[in-house]
Amino acid sequence: MNNTYPHPIIAREGWPYLGGIFIVTLIVQAAAGFGWAWPFWVLTLFVLQFFRDPARAVPTQANAILSPADGRIVAVEQVRDPYADRDSLKISVFMNVFNVHSNRAPVDGTVQQVQYFPGKFVNADLDKASLENERNAIVLRRADGQLVTSVQVAGLIARRILCYTKAGEVLTRGQRYGFIRFGSRVDVYLPLTARPRVTIGEKVSATLTVLAELD
């Protein structure tokens, strides 16, 4: 395991929310005492938990495909990868509102393309969400030439996809590249030769869980 993963423990996307509610809480406590302020302290703790972004040890196996998100496996199937135009193995992770919302690179690789698609906001737990919902796809090329596509998909509640990478950049496994507020779904498209290491219904953790292995 590689434990080098510099980043804030609280996702930067949550700093404005946390700062705002913390200031309001202090004002209420100063003006009216703890009896009135305790609900605001509870809300502050909820926001703190909601935007947590804990460090993750990165597995060092060269051929491991790491989970890009915390959540539950909802699909392991052979489909067409519409972003890299190839047949592929798709593994999908559904993220609920209580999961960590950061998205991380599943492999080391160079970003070949970043594609944004407007769309619907149906329940991300449904298969049709993969191609009908608003989404953002990045295609990564490993050093051996194999392609891995990671797609952030919006959902019924999650309507804010953030992606911080662009074509030409190099990502390392476990590197934070995006964020989906209020959870949702991430689809990973792999070469057909990839061997899945997870099953439908299994809970996974971003970076820590190996989704599949490449030949």
From Swiss-Prot:
Disulfide bonds: none
Modified residues (Pyruvic acid (Ser)): S184
PANTHER family reported for this sequence: ARCHAETIDYLSERINE DECARBOXYLASE PROENZYME-RELATED
GO molecular function: phosphatidylserine decarboxylase activity
Any one of the GO CC terms: plasma membrane
Record note on modification: Is synthesized initially as an inactive proenzyme. Formation of the active enzyme involves a self-maturation process in which the active site pyruvoyl group is generated from an internal serine residue via an autocatalytic post-translational modification. Two non-identical subunits are generated from the proenzyme in this reaction, and the pyruvate is formed at the N-terminus of the alpha chain, which is derived from the carboxyl end of the proenzyme.
Pathway listed: Phospholipid metabolism; phosphatidylethanolamine biosynthesis; phosphatidylethanolamine from CDP-diacylglycerol: step 2/2
Site (Cleavage (non-hydrolytic)): G183, S184
Presence of keyword Lipid biosynthesis: yes
Subunit: Heterodimer of a large membrane-associated beta subunit and a small pyruvoyl-containing alpha subunit.
HAMAP family the record matches: PS_decarb_PSD_A
Pfam families, alphabetized: PS_Dcarbxylase (PF02666)
Domain of life: Bacteria
Subcellular location: Cell membrane
Coiled-coil ranges per UniProt: none
Transmembrane parts of this sequence: none
Purpose: Catalyzes the formation of phosphatidylethanolamine (PtdEtn) from phosphatidylserine (PtdSer).
UniProt organism field: Ralstonia pickettii (strain 12J)
Enzyme class: lyase
Underlying gene: psd
Family of this protein: Belongs to the phosphatidylserine decarboxylase family. PSD-A subfamily.
Name of the protein: Phosphatidylserine decarboxylase proenzyme
Highest classification ranks of the organism: Bacteria, Pseudomonadati, Pseudomonadota, Betaproteobacteria, Burkholderiales
Cofactor(s) of this protein: pyruvate
Topology with respect to the bilayer: Peripheral membrane protein
Entry annotation: catalytic residues: S184 (schiff-base intermediate with substrate)
Cofactor binding annotation: Binds 1 pyruvoyl group covalently per subunit.
Keywords for the protein's UniProt record, in alphabetical order: Cell membrane, Decarboxylase, Lipid biosynthesis, Lipid metabolism, Lyase, Membrane, Phospholipid biosynthesis, Phospholipid metabolism, Pyruvate, Zymogen
Signal peptide: none
